[in-house]
Amino acid sequence: KKGDAKHIRLEFCNQRSTPAEIRMGYAYQSDIDFSEAKRLAAKADLVVFCAGLDGSIELEGRDRPFDLPYGQDMLIQELVKVNPKLIVAIHAGGGINMTRWIDQVPAVVHALYPGQEGGHALAHILSGKVNPSAKLPFTIEKRWEDSPACGHYDETRKEKKVYYTEGIFTGYRGYDQKGIEPLFPFG
């Protein structure tokens, strides 16, 4: 029942040489109430929405999702309905699925992980004080299935080896060779 305390018992045996670790999480409901965020966005001159991943999702030794977590896609779609002057600042170490809302927002800045002065840097870019040159250091695909890495992240595979058979056709060259149009190309 909602609101009642839950008792959870976790037992496991670590049989590898790597440190033991247990991760717990939760899932957001699809009926999240965005009314307060929408109310504030509706009366703003401009909305800068910082979306992305955090250290619990994107870290060394783990695969991270291509989709934005925690209902961020839904929130972006709701905010742009009430204020079309919406800038989405993405904080992630690579590409993110933007196809659910990219055609509705006027601007996206892929800020990567900018560090402690990232807020100032983003403000300087958005105000026009600094020109970021609009160059991406990687290609952002439209779909995860378009990524050259996609086939290597199947947890059901028994063999966990990656064979680099693409030769020089990595990154943007691979997209060109296969005729895949990315969402945002390298450079």
Predicted regions and their residues:
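C-terminal non-catalytic regions of proteins with extracellular/luminal or membrane-system context
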Residues: 1-187
